Each structure stands twice: as structure tokens, then as C-alpha cells.
Amino acid sequence: MKKILRLVFILVYTNISTFVSAHELEDAASFTADELDRLLEDPPGCIQLAMRPIFEKCVLNGIHAVDPKDRRSSAIEMSVCEFESAGVEYPAECSTTDYDTCIWKLGLVPQYWTTFSGNYRDIGLFCEGVSRNNEKEQLVLLYSNITKVFAGFRHAFYESYSKSQEMKDEMEEGFSRWSADFDIAKDQHKEFYEFVAKQQEHIKIELMKNQKVIFDFHDEQEVRFNSYSNHIVDVIDSMAVDLDIILAKLADDGIIEDMENQKSKSLDIMKSYSEDAELTLSRIVSELERVGIIQKNDVSIVENLNSGLADTSNKVSKLNKDFEDLDSHFQHTKDLIESEVSFLFANLIGEMETKLSQALENVDDRIELHFVSQLEFLDKSLNETWEAILTFKQDWQIFTSIFENFENIPKSISHFVTSGLYKTNEILTQTSYFWSTILNIPVSLLSNILRYTMAASWIAILFILISLRYGSTKSFLLVIMVLLVVFLNTHRW
């Protein structure tokens, strides 16, 4: 058992040591895209200078536009920055342009390789983040331009609508004046018609009287009619002149020309808006096509990663061999730990054995004390039972002497049974706790069982003794009397 615990402790210690040493450097060397973004906003430093060669390509076209060599060199420079800031030694080739040798030496040490691979991965995340932000800004700018164009069109439309409303009001005012003139002319024409009708009627009457007067009046009326007709024509000509004046005024004010210009501008704006919308749709289609190309490139990258993983597995096998060599260096430490743990476990087990022995001794003492107390209680109960038997014998003698005097039998039986019941109840009370502990039966249940058993025994013995001396009939009557006495005294139990 000690050897098994020793082996488990050594394995756990080795795994924890390896895990902590590898992950502490990984946590110290890894950068997220948000952290790189934040660093690039600060004054230029080591990390910023390492990211500067690929930053513009990342912003414009994403990680796929970055040359793998540039990405590799930036990752190496970032790793060097971290090593220098942490005070960790690193291969000298990483300070020069001999990146192949640098990467090969970084792969020999898990901590170095973790830092380099984390930076290489974070560069991809950073490029994807900044390229997407750039695309987002371009789309927001395009949307802002479309919004501005639409706002200009809306403003021009409202201005045109306002001017059209003003012109409409002016035209309605002119038409109202014309309508008033027409109403006046209508009234005059109606009055003239009524006057003509009256005159015709008068003419019909006077025609026969004076034809010459009629012809003169006809000529006069014709003259008046021509005069009125000329007046109507003049009014219409005046209205036409007013209309020409209004149109000329509108032309002079440039309202008609403004309406034509607003119309042409609206058409141009709508045409520009349509062209911008078509351009936006074409850009969206091209973006979708580019996303498809990126997905295809991702598939090829995954295939390249699979081949790279195969090479990595070979390197891992080499690393395992190196770890086996390194394991011999830990052997001395393991031996020291094993001896120390063995000593600790020996002390611990000895202490546990001592405490266990003390606990067992205490248990033995407690069991012995309990058993002795139970034996003493049993002996006491047996003595009390024997005393109760002697008392019962004396009571029985009294009982037999009572039967000699038949007249006092009920009273004697009552006294006898009552004293017997008291003794029986006392015996049961004294012994029930002991036998309930031995038989593992509840005290109340055991007391009831013993009481009813003793009562039945008493009745049976009483019936047998009385029947032997007085016969079965008298015995039956006496037993009934005893049962009545017992029934009447059950509450005293």
C-alpha cells in the first residue's frame, strides 16, 4: 500500500510540474486580437514595430493577403519582444534574419514553441478583426453617402412641393377673381334676358299699334345688345390679358423654370440613387464572391494544416525522445521526494495506528462496562423475580386459606388478584428494559406481551387449582369473578 501511494504521488507531482511550467509561459506569451489592437493604438513599441509590415495588408484584404514569410517574421519578432520583456533567454538566430534556424530551435523547447505558435495564431485573429472593421467602416460610409443623397433629394422635393403649393394658391386666387367676374356677367346677362323678354312681350302688344316705333325700338335694342356684347368681349379680353400677365410674371420670376429644374434635378437624383444602388448591389455580389473564394482558400489552408500536423507529429515524436532524456535529470529529485514522502507516510501511518489502537481500547472498555452493567441489571432482575416468586408462594398460601371460608372468597380473591397483579406489574417493569435490549424489541410491546402472558397464566393456574378442590362448576364461577375483578382493576395497571 505504501509503494502504491508513493508511486501515485510521484506521478501527480511530475504531471503538475510539467503542466505548470508549460502553461505559465503560454499564458505569459499569448496575445489576443483585442490586446494587439489596443497595443497598436499606443505609442510605437516593440510589438507595434513587429506588426507594422503586415498591418496595411491586414486592414485592406485580411490575413489571406499577408505573405506567410511576413507573418512568420512578425510572429518571431513578437516572440522576441516577449522574451526580452520577460528576461527569458532565446536562440540568437531569432535576432537576425535566419528565421528558419530560429523556428527550428524554437521547436526544440515547448515553451518557446508555445509562444511562437500563439503569436502566429493571434496575428491571424488580429488581421481578421481589423479587416472586418475596415469592411464595416466602408459599408457604413456607403450607407452614409446613400443617406445623404436621399436626404438631399427629400429636401429638394419638399422645396419644389412648397413652391408648387404657393403657385397653386396664387392660381386659386386668380380663378376666384375670374369666378366673381363670371358671376357678375351671368347676373347681367340674366337681367338683360329678363329685360329682353319683357320688351318682347311689350313689343308683341305694341307691334300692332306702331310698327315704326317697333322698328326704332328694335334698332335701339340691337344697338344696346351689340354694346353689351362688346362689353362681354372686352371683359373676356381683359381676363385673357390678366392671365397672360400672370403667366408672364411667373416666367419672369423663374418659377416655371425652377419647376422644370427641380423636375430635372429630381430625375437626376433618382437616377444617381439608382446607379448607387446598382453599384452597392454589385459590390455586395463581389463581396459574396470574395467570401466564397475565402472559404475555398480556408479549405486549402485546412488541407495544408493537416499536412503540417503530420510533420508536427514527427516533431512531437522527436520531442518525446528528448523528454525521455530529460526524465533522467528528474530522477534524483524523484528519489529525494520518494524518501521524504516515505518518511511522512511512515509517521502518518504510525500515528494513525496509535490513534486506532486507542480508539479500539476505548471501544473495548465501553463494551465491557456496558456488558457488566447489563449483567448486574440481569442479576438484580433475577433476584427480584425470585423474591416475587416467594411472595407469590406466600400469597398462594393465603389464597388457599381464603377458600376455606367461602363467604369471604370474592373479597379474598380480589385482594389476592390485586396483590398478584401488582407484583406481576412490578416484575414486568423491572425486566422489560433488560429483555427489550437483549431481544431488540420495543419496551412497550414487550411489556404488553409479558403482561397478557402472565395474566393468562394466572387465570389458568387459578382455574386448575380451584377445579381440583371445588369442582369445575364452582371453578368456572370463581374464574368469572376473578376476570370481573381484573377487568375492574385494569386501570390500576
Swiss-Prot record:
Disulphide bond pairs: none
Superkingdom of source: Eukaryota
GO annotation terms (biological process): karyogamy involved in conjugation with cellular fusion; nuclear membrane fusion involved in karyogamy
Gene Ontology cellular-component annotations: endoplasmic reticulum membrane; nuclear membrane
Stretches in topological domain Cytoplasmic: 467-469
Signal peptide (UniProt feature, chain positions): 1-22
Assigned keywords, A-Z: Endoplasmic reticulum, Glycoprotein, Karyogamy, Membrane, Nucleus, Signal, Transmembrane, Transmembrane helix
Cell compartment(s), UniProt: Endoplasmic reticulum membrane; Nucleus membrane
Membrane topology (UniProt): Multi-pass membrane protein
Sequence intervals crossing the membrane: 446-466, 470-490
Topological domains annotated Lumenal: 23-445, 491-493
Glycosylation sites per record: N15, N145, N383
Main localization, broad class: endoplasmic reticulum
Job description of the protein: Required for nuclear membrane fusion during karyogamy.
UniProt similarity note: Belongs to the KAR5 family.
Protein name: Nuclear fusion protein KAR5
Gene giving rise to this polypeptide: KAR5
